[in-house]
Amino acid sequence: KGRQTFTNIEEVVEADYSNAAFLDAFNLLDGFVKVKGLKTSSYQGDKRYKKYFKELEENMPTLDISNCVDLGPILMMIGCFKNGVVLTGTKRLAIKESNRAIAMKEELEKFGAKIDVGENKVIIEKVPLHKPLEILDGHNDHRIVMALAVLLSKFGGKISGYEAVNKS
């Protein structure tokens, strides 16, 4: 115990799928962002974002986020912009930096979104969106700010509390 020796190791930390999802989301709103360095053999639950993005493009899917809860805000945003979405496994959204389901509902409704938040499910209907008439609130949550920033790139507007992204 007292005479242990530390041996250096060299490891490469793989890219973060959760943060990559926010960047890749710009492409669904007619942007052009290249996301590089993601390992397809990753064990990160958030790597399913690419599959979920494809499903959001095609129809109003039901997506289980119980093992990738950090994707909740960006999937809610895309669901509003595309074809709607039913997210299940959402109860852990309430115990993050903010109650992410409620925070996204409040902010996305400023765009005209129609969202129902249940205990473990979020339902977002496809409705026309518009530029928000008021300043959005980042809810002191970096993932809320990042998801809203993607949508604001399409509609314009402002976010208060954007400094929360410094965590990312």
Pin down the residues of each PLM region.
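Short, structured segments at the rim of ligand-binding sites
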Residues: K1-S168
